[in-house]
From Swiss-Prot:
GO process annotations (BP): ribosomal small subunit biogenesis; translation
Quaternary structure (record): Part of the 30S ribosomal subunit. Contacts protein S5. The interaction surface between S4 and S5 is involved in control of translational fidelity.
Subcellular localization(s) per the UniProt record: Plastid, Chloroplast
Function: One of the primary rRNA binding proteins, it binds directly to 16S rRNA where it nucleates assembly of the body of the 30S subunit. With S5 and S12 plays an important role in translational accuracy.
SUPFAM superfamilies: Alpha-L RNA-binding motif
Source species: Libertia formosa
CDD domains, per the entry: S4
Primary site of residence: plastid
GO molecular function, one term: structural constituent of ribosome
Protein name: Small ribosomal subunit protein uS4c
A Gene Ontology cellular-component term: chloroplast
């Protein structure tokens, strides 16, 4: 994980750690001239590792985004940002996207009152995301909300930390997308 961060730069969804400033110097010395192929490959790898996707999943999302109206890149980022695991991360219910995936896989999360155990579930506007009523589920979310740095919440999401409830208001705006891709 840390090799990926040193190579690609900060990936907030993968881990809370940041690369040291000295590693940038090493990369600059080693890099030389960056080819167009290398730039595209690094940007693709950033997407894969940040959102925790396999190559096949990413290709499916690119295919869906290509069919949709609008800029393929913007539609792709909107699709990835509207995944359930990413929304839990943005709400602060999990400290990282892999942590959010684990919450979903272990059936701690309800969407509109139903258990959802698929991290790639595509959330829609007006979806209500809550935790199970079990004490263990609420404790996991409470620890994450308490320990997470209180960053500004994107305007397409609202959270009620006392009821452990989040709401998807609308499809994400392009200015709120967390990962900067070239």
């Amino acid at each position: 994980r840390f090799k990926k961060i040193r190579r690609l730069g900060a990936l907030p969804g993968l881990t809370n750690k940041r690369p040291r400033s000295g590693s940038d110097l090493k990369n600059q010395l080693r890099s030389g001239k960056r080819s167009q192929y290398r730039i595209r490959l690094e940007e693709k790898q950033k997407l894969r590792f940040h959102y925790g996707l396999t190559e096949r999943q990413l290709l499916k999302y690119v295919h869906i985004a290509g069919k949709a109206k609008g800029s393929t890149g913007q539609v792709l980022l909107q699709l990835l940002e509207m995944r359930l695991d990413n929304i839990l991360f943005r709400l602060g219910m999990a400290s990282t996207i892999p942590g959010a995936r684990q919450l979903v896989n272990h059936r701690h999360i309800l969407v509109n009152g139903r258990i959802v155990d698929i991290p790639s579930y595509r959330c829609k506007p007006r979806d209500i995301i809550t935790t199970k009523d079990k004490q263990r589920s609420k404790a996991l979310i409470q620890n994450s909300i308490a320990s997470s740095p209180h960053e500004e919440l994107p305007n397409h999401l609202t959270i009620d930390p006392f009821q452990y409830k989040g709401l998807v208001n609308q499809i994400i705006d392009s200015k709120w997308i967390g990962l900067k891709i070239n």
